[in-house]
């Protein structure tokens, strides 16, 4: 029983050591922190705010009309989803 525990411990320790060595050699090839941060905070053109002719959900609708599928709330002056109690 002690032999089995020792062999499991050595196997686990060997796997951890292998992981650490592989990670260290991989992180030397590239600057991991800078690369990771730049990929996280990269701004894609699809996600940039675009100017529209209509106001989207929860946008102010005083000067602009709401986009299709939304109505201008008479109380808050925001574009909201149409609902039976808002008609």
Swiss-Prot record:
Signal peptide: 1-24
Entry annotated with the keyword Secreted: yes
Spans through the membrane: none
GO cellular-component term (any): extracellular region
Key words of the record: Disulfide bond, Ion channel impairing toxin, Knottin, Secreted, Signal, Toxin
SUPFAM superfamilies: omega toxin-like (SSF57059)
Pfam families: Toxin_12
Prodomain positions: 25-52
Subcellular location: Secreted
Cystine pairs: 54-67, 61-72, 66-79
Tissue spec: Expressed by the venom gland.
A single MF term (Gene Ontology): toxin activity
Function, in words: Ion channel inhibitor.
Family: Belongs to the neurotoxin 10 (Hwtx-1) family. 51 (Hntx-8) subfamily. Hntx-8 sub-subfamily.
Comment on protein domains: The presence of a 'disulfide through disulfide knot' structurally defines this protein as a knottin.
Name of the molecule in the record: U3-theraphotoxin-Hhn1a 6
């Amino acid at each position: 029983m002690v032999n089995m525990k020792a062999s499991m411990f050595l196997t686990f320790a060997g796997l951890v050591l292998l992981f650490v060595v592989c990670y260290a050699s991989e992180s030397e090839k590239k600057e991991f922190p800078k690369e990771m941060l730049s990929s996280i905070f990269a701004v894609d053109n699809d996600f940039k705010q675009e100017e529209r002719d209509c106001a989207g959900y929860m946008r102010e609708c005083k000067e602009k009309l709401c986009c299709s599928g939304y109505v201008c709330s008479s109380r808050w002056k925001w574009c909201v989803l149409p609902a039976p109690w808002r008609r």
